């Protein structure tokens, strides 16, 4: 949600700021702006509603010169998406960009109005600008003023601030919303996501919770919550990402669907050996500690939560470990029993999801045995704060609707199931079966992608529909949930998912000739039960679309279309059956003409509550 870019350099940095914002477009936004200070201490500010390109066009019309600047893409929380609410916000010579929410902004606003400040916008961000301005007038440096302001702010935020009277310095403050410093040669940068800075540097410092950083062209000074100078680790990034390169694909989502075989291969690389899963990357003490796990608690949001629901079936059936899955925003506010023998697993593509981070921190207070994160971004907050981390190696995922991050999360979770099962004394033959299935997975998905044209034609049936129902059983039920989420995210069709056995308990009332029902039907022990559910829908005139194993015994009939899929190993069937539902959602969205990569009202990384 939202994006921040900042730069301090000897060269003009407007183009760097604009390019950084372009690389953050995938996070979702409704307006964009920048402020640049030149060597004569003149500040130039420009804000536009709409795409970053609108801002770029305005910059082209009136060249913006200067080597110190900040820029922002805004996703509205306080105040409508219009120019006056777009960032940066200013108070005389102070300019601020900010991600997150200041929970006590109304109280601060009243205090500032009493001091004579006038508010132009409806945002919570403007209080930061005025507070810093007020503290500056009381004396001290910009850094000292900000250090006095921060304790007065309640909420989760990341803010970058500059003073036009002091070109060559920008200050960053992190409290719950990610910020990263990019290290250059005679120039330094700031952003909310390292992707924004890849054209100018590969060296990064990730700010930790409560950090305040003073960044100049040649120096970076970081202070912790006690105001003491601290050193933070420098990380060399190997992420490959070209924001403008969709290659032969129309959208990032389409590209990322097709990248899944390679993403899974990368995720499996060096982790499968001689019929075993090799997770030695967890360190020498991991096996001894994880062998003590008596219960697993998974917390996640959105698509990652659906991955957690699939893995619950695996952890219990294959590793024999009791497992619960909970939405992170519910877990963090529920009064939980203490869990001394419990492993907390967090799932997040970005590693910065606010509710998931809060759940991790809560688990430490509750006495959990240990924590492990499955994440796609090295150096992210979840990776740094968890005891153990297993990285998905999906590469940058730009489309808001997650595809390859989901399937690589499931891939890692299945490896973890095999590893924990071995620690618990599960038969070695089962681990060998998991390893065999995982080896086969990339080629199985490549075969699935060859069905794309069939699904493209099928999608035409959905162009005039307003609702859809997804059904599955067992570990395919969460896949039905994920399919419904994808369809509603990018095509704006209202879609719900149920365990097929729940039809009689309510959803059957929705079935009529205008309600498409999408069913995932692998050839497993639940197939006959699922066929009974299918007949219940047929008897009531429902429109059935069944993604079925080619050996499951289905044939097309009136009111029922069968999409036959190649047989796949049962262990990896949930991952495999995800792909046709991704393709269906993508093609329906194309037909409806929605913004596939940046669907309305949604953001890629939700870093606030």
UniProtKB/Swiss-Prot annotation:
Keyword Transferase found: yes
SIS domain span: 286-426, 458-599
Subcellular location: Cytoplasm
Top-level taxon: Bacteria
Record's GO cellular component terms: cytosol
Entry keyword annotation includes Transferase: yes
Enzyme Commission designation: 2.6.1.16
Chief site of localization: cytoplasm
Gene Ontology molecular function terms on file: carbohydrate derivative binding; glutamine-fructose-6-phosphate transaminase (isomerizing) activity
Transmembrane feature ranges: none
Catalytic activity: D-fructose 6-phosphate + L-glutamine = D-glucosamine 6-phosphate + L-glutamate
Protein keywords: Aminotransferase, Cytoplasm, Glutamine amidotransferase, Repeat, Transferase
Residue ranges constituting the Glutamine amidotransferase type-2 domain according to the UniProt record: 2-218
Subunit note: Homodimer.
Function (record text): Catalyzes the first step in hexosamine metabolism, converting fructose-6P into glucosamine-6P using glutamine as a nitrogen source.
Name this polypeptide is given: Glutamine--fructose-6-phosphate aminotransferase [isomerizing]
